[in-house]
Amino acid sequence: MRLDRYDQQILQVLQHDGRINNQDLAERIGLSPSPCLRRVRALEESGLIMGYRAMLDAKKLGLTLIAL
């Protein structure tokens, strides 16, 4: 899959904020919501976006040992 500047911007924004809604994402990269959503779905279907995850704070969860 060939990435243009919009695709690259989408990936960059989602790396920093995977919970951003499509409307806000579209505004940040300068697209209207429909084409933005189509691009996100295409990136997901191509496997470039493999998922969305939560990062947990081990200390706040009371976990003192982390095994790798």
What are these model-predicted stretches?
Residues M1-L68:
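A compositional/biophysical signature of low hydrophobicity enriched in polar/charged and small residues
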